[in-house]
Amino acid sequence: MGGGLVKKNLVLSVSIFAVVLLFSINSSYAARETIRITCWEGYADAAMVKQFKSLVKKKYKIVVDVKASYPKDQDEFYKAAKDGTADLISPPADVAKTPRFYCFQEGNFLLAEVDLKNIPNAKNLIPFFAADKSLTHQEKRYGLPYNCGPYGLDYNTAIVKEAPKSWNIFWDPQYKGKYTINNNFPKCNIWITALALGYKYDQIFDIEKLDRAKIQEKLNVLAQNAKSLWDGSANPDEFPQLALATDWGFAAAQANKKGGKWLIAAPKEGGTAWIDYWCITQAAKGTKKKLCEEWINLQLSPKAQAAVVKNQGVSPVVNNVGKLVTATEKNLFHVGDNAYFETVAIWQVMSEKTEKAFGEMWEEAKKLRQK
């Protein structure tokens, strides 16, 4: 009897070991997926990635790895889509239809149509953004808005006591050497220079409607008197030394987290604004594409859109964030304010001639910084 008991215990032990071993093997071979994201820095932060991984594991029983890369220029979004090195990209709205970046060549679409059934949070888009056709082609949608912000006029309230009323403050001699402006989006500086000269929204996106020589003269001064030029995003560590800055909103938000007192002005001439989209490239197929749609849906959730305000210093695109932000944030970043977005000039696709001219004008202006 004793020997039988030992045998039974031995069999039981072996069985338990086998079950544990089998479970371990199955766990090690659990479904895995990698999502490659090319996006502006901050759009795939650690908190968002952690939340996404948890969601995917719970909903799909998939262990997902997120590999993010951060471009400095918009051409990197096009290259990532063209080369298939990213599954998700976050380009400005006008990129996909800009001639040199065109993503809808017959027989060679670089982007995948999004399935709105998998992105239920899209129903909360503010009407202005829901109606935007930037990423619509042949009545099909190839992306969804994520956030919106200005090429804004930021001012340091510790130095500039009253809110600037005009873009012309950049040409005020007292601020020579005390401001920073963008370098790698030449069009933005031509736009604000044109607005400062009195041109209207329906003129600034077309070189044929502008006096090139007149704008060049003023642009030269803007470039020459800047303390610095920034690529990608302005450097918040430089902000304590500055009185003024152009900014997407990100740098001012970061500077304020470090004790800065920066605000965004509302120039009387108006201003331009970008919309960044989430787009899925043709590289994402099957389950990978569905996981990309889950990412977009998560990014349109109230919590993620509130983070757009608090972490990025720009505007959310949905209408259900109001309770998650302060009254000051709601006012400053026009949270849920559809009427406001109707008043700004959203970046438009420009002709190759205009793009080329603006690039040449900026390079000419920068030459004066070297003298």
Named regions from a protein language model:
Residues 31-103:
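Early extracytoplasmic/lumenal segment of secretory-pathway proteins
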Residues 44-46, 90-236:
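Extracytoplasmic ligand-binding site segments that recognize negatively charged/polar headgroups
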Residues 94-101, 244-261:
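A ligand-binding cleft/hinge motif common to bilobed small-molecule-binding domains
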Residues 110-123, 143, 260-272, 282-284:
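Short beta-strand->loop
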Residues 152-159, 194-195, 275-288, 307-311:
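A bilobed periplasmic-binding-protein/Venus flytrap-type ligand-binding module shared by bacterial periplasmic
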Residues 178-188, 211-222, 258-282, 298-322:
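Periplasmic-binding protein-like
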Residues 306-371:
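C-terminal capping/gating helix-and-loop segments adjacent to ligand/active sites or protein-protein/ligand interfaces
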